[in-house]
């Protein structure tokens, strides 16, 4: 891990091929203001005070050349993101201006920041706990409004405060028990039943957190949905209708889609990656064969398969063959997935036709009737997908916060340690045995919030951040 007396610099805005309106270069550290003063020319008598914005020019101190017209934002310690002196150059957008300003900052004595180092400094300086720091990364990566709201809840302490209270209760119980070990004759005996009740209450609180883990993972990472079926059943039309775009080429010619086309959607707060695949059939065309093979691989990697059928033709032998292939490969790879049958081209049927009017010679399976051409039934498709997800006990609804995978693993350890404490109490073991697992629970909670954490854990967490955050 780097030394944190250094002054660090990074581009804090996204670097994209398209030019942005503003690009920001951020400095943090003891030399941030001095470096800024060596590079920034502020006309007139503008005061260099905290939380003031200065107008002026960035100059190369060696050549005196003007690099950019910019605004300078000063945030002096401790009233800053990192609780160090922080300076931001607000430059014109585009790659060249911000890169030149960053190079000048480094030449003046700053070093390039590591990924997540600004937030790491905020954590080390006590502005954020570890769950709040993780929430920063989750907010930046959020793919839906729901994911952003959950990340913001973590950032504002909805995770940190109750977890700290659970840890404090563990430490208080430890103090009570260890006092009896040290001063056996001077203190009244403990009430094992009362201690056990407190432990059970802690377990209930931990279980409430653990119950959010699966839903949190779903909201953060989303679902991968593969649209599969034989050629010309309307798979690409379904993708276009669902995404309200023309991502996929649509023609009457079988085999038009030769490669996988992706689209990103949000349904009920859940990010969904939709994969439109090539029509699955036997073919002599080498390029189409590759597309068909990729379709099969995409189906196996998906969380949900939409098997599209031409409702005007009904269930055909080709549809059955595709269904059988999917079932066989899933069994071989032990990767069970949800399958939803989509009866497309309802516009070619009578308006009174319902799903039950179209016989499907397979086990009962969720089925939706729709028309990609007229975009009728898309809402019912989304409802069916949400129903499948919720049927597995996972929903994005009514979720105020959610723990991530790291936090869930540590809380599982806490729950197990508390179980061991209850077992020790029930077995009437000496008090020393109670303290062993209470210490373990408190340590796991400390690792979770950052109150007891190793350098390797911090490195692992913050390496996943973007540079400049």
From Swiss-Prot:
It comes from Thermosynechococcus vestitus (strain NIES-2133 / IAM M-273 / BP-1). Homodimer. Heterotetramer of two MnmE and two MnmG subunits. Belongs to the TRAFAC class TrmE-Era-EngA-EngB-Septin-like GTPase superfamily. TrmE GTPase family. Gene3D superfamilies: P-loop containing nucleotide triphosphate hydrolases, Probable tRNA modification gtpase trme, domain 1, tRNA modification GTPase MnmE domain 2. The lineage of its organism: Bacteria, Bacillati, Cyanobacteriota, Cyanophyceae, Acaryochloridales. Its main location: cytoplasm. The keyword Zinc-finger does not apply. It is found in: Cytoplasm. This is tRNA modification GTPase MnmE. One of its GO terms (molecular function) is GTP binding. Keywords: Cytoplasm, GTP-binding, Hydrolase, Magnesium, Metal-binding, Nucleotide-binding, Potassium, tRNA processing. The keyword Cell cycle does not apply. PROSITE patterns: G_TRME (PS51709). K(+) binds at residues 232, 251, 253, 256. (6S)-5-formyl-5,6,7,8-tetrahydrofolate binds at residues 26, 88, 127, 469.
